[in-house]
């Protein structure tokens, strides 16, 4: 039977935990070369980006920073919309680019190579999982909750979905 060991990762002022089959740090260095890190601009996801960057630096890994923006919703068309589709797209794209630029800057300051992705999807969890496969990521490193905050007691709903459906390890930053 495989044994499981809990690794505590000292990443500055927080204590994220990862459960996995027993591995040595050398094995972790081999296992994790590309880490997908979702960010939605919330303080928790910003801390997760910094934690992921410190973790990646200790392993010599790189980060793939992703933000998922919701496409314009055509539901409730009778509802008053203060902005056009084009205005909405421009606004959410600008916000996403700013969010990714901030995350990349933090990675650069820590000295970790990173690339950025902006994806449009009504399902952030599905987009995260799809992009982790597309970019050959070894692990997803994400905040325990984001914009939904208290939608779930312990974990955000998107984090729960990624944990449930991802075929690669998921590290949850708390």
Where are these regions (language model features)?
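Short, flexible loop segments at boundaries between secondary-structure elements
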Residues: 168-173
């Amino acid at each position: 039977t495989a044994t499981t060991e809990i690794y505590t990762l000292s990443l500055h002022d927080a204590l994220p935990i990862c459960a996995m089959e027993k591995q040595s740090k050398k094995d972790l260095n081999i296992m994790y070369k590309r880490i997908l890190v979702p960010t939605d601009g919330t303080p928790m996801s910003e801390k997760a980006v910094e934690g992921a960057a410190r973790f990646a630096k200790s392993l010599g890994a790189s980060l793939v920073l992703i933000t998922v923006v919701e496409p314009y919703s055509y539901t409730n068309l009778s509802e008053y919309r203060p902005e056009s589709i084009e205005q909405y797209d421009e606004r959410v794209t600008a916000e996403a680019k700013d969010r990714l630029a901030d995350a990349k800057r933090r990675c650069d300051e820590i000295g970790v190579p990173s690339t950025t992705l902006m994806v449009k999807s009504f399902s952030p969890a599905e987009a995260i999982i799809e992009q982790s496969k597309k970019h050959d990521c070894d692990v997803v490193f994400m905040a325990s909750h984001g914009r939904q905050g208290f939608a779930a007691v312990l974990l955000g709903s998107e984090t729960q979905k990624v944990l449930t459906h991802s075929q690669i390890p998921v590290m949850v930053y708390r």
